[in-house]
A protein has these predicted regions:
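The conserved Walker
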Residues: 43-45, 102
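Hydrophobic positions on the alpha1 helix immediately C-terminal to the Walker A/P-loop
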Residues: 51
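Conserved nucleotide-sensing/catalytic segment adjacent to the nucleotide-binding pocket
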Residues: 65-126
Length: 144
């Protein structure tokens, strides 16, 4: 079986290629005193949150359930209590960051925070079905 995989991979027909490019990009960004904000998008029930958690766990060995948030209050608490260079996964950030609620004070507070908190060295992954569901001000500061 391995011979067949090698045969097709050498000809550019592999189903997927494994590369450390993504991990190297994240590590390089962190090494240059930057943080990571990322949107994890895809159809509902397809594993966006699980993937985000796996990324966070690989990047931060201390990542745990307290770093998974579902609303603004949990997000604020996680940001205040987590260590430097912590990773936070915000599942379905519709509450507080919805593109339809751009005029609400809570939305303004969160987007301003996301635009200015790099010095705290916190990293956030947002899991949601479409990037357009999150406020534009938050989208533009996301790395991916």
């Amino acid at each position: 079986m391995m011979e067949a995989q090698t045969f097709w991979a050498e000809r550019g027909h592999a189903y997927y290629y494994q590369s450390d490019w993504f991990w190297n990009e994240l590590k390089e960004r962190l090494a240059t005193d930057k943080n990571v904000l990322g949107l994890v998008t895809g159809h509902t029930g397809r594993g966006k949150t699980c993937w985000a958690i796996k990324v966070a766990r690989r990047m931060d060995e201390t990542f745990g359930p307290d770093n998974i948030v579902f609303d603004y209050n949990q997000f604020r608490n996680a940001m205040e209590t987590s260590h430097e260079y912590a990773w936070i996964v915000w599942d379905e950030p519709n509450k507080g960051l919805s593109h339809r609620d751009w005029f609400l004070d809570i939305n303004k507070a969160i987007t301003t925070y996301l635009q200015t908190f790099r010095f705290r060295h916190k990293n956030v992954l947002f899991a949601l079905p479409k990037a357009s569901l999150i406020d534009k001000s938050a989208r533009v500061v996301c790395l991916f």
